[in-house]
Amino acid sequence: MEVDCRVISRGKGRGPVLVSTEPLSFLGGVDPGTGRVIDQKHPLHGRSIRGKVLLIPGGKGSTVGSYVIFQMAKNETAPAAIICLNAEPIIATGAIMAGIPMVDRPSEDLLGLLEDSMEVEVDADEGKIRF
């Protein structure tokens, strides 16, 4: 299936999808050294986002979260791509700085279509999500 979306940060990323219905804060919520979600109240707690296509409603928290995403890219612990239902400036800035493909506003209800570990491709050059 192919879903249209808005491009935030260009590039292509592919991998198993990691789905959350809760927004994620990268500052204090994700360990940039390992790529694991460390926010104990988040549904993804203990899971690694490294090399995954991360599907979240959006981000939350401090603007320093952008730099956490950038540090994750430097540490090679970043997601392969990010899909937000509605992007906000913190994650968008981090993805752009880190060169992580990112899209938002999918034309279909991805939370109803995608399940953890499904193989997903984000083509943030063309504005397409394929699975």
Swiss-Prot record:
NCBIfam families: PRK03955.1. It is an enzyme of class 4 (lyase). One of its GO terms (molecular function) is hydro-lyase activity. Heterodimer composed of a large subunit (PMDh-L) and a small subunit (PMDh-S). Gene3D superfamilies: Phosphohistidine domain. InterPro entries: PMDh-S-like, PMDh-S-like_dom, PMDh_S. The active site is at 62 (proton acceptor). Pathway: Isoprenoid biosynthesis; isopentenyl diphosphate biosynthesis via mevalonate pathway. GO terms for biological process: isopentenyl diphosphate biosynthetic process, mevalonate pathway. HAMAP family: PMDh_S (MF_00078). Belongs to the AcnX type II small subunit family. The keyword Lyase applies. This is Phosphomevalonate dehydratase small subunit. The lineage of its organism: Archaea, Methanobacteriati, Methanobacteriota, Methanomada group, Methanobacteria. Component of a hydro-lyase that catalyzes the dehydration of mevalonate 5-phosphate (MVA5P) to form trans-anhydromevalonate 5-phosphate (tAHMP). Involved in the archaeal mevalonate (MVA) pathway, which provides fundamental precursors for isoprenoid biosynthesis, such as isopentenyl diphosphate (IPP) and dimethylallyl diphosphate (DMAPP).
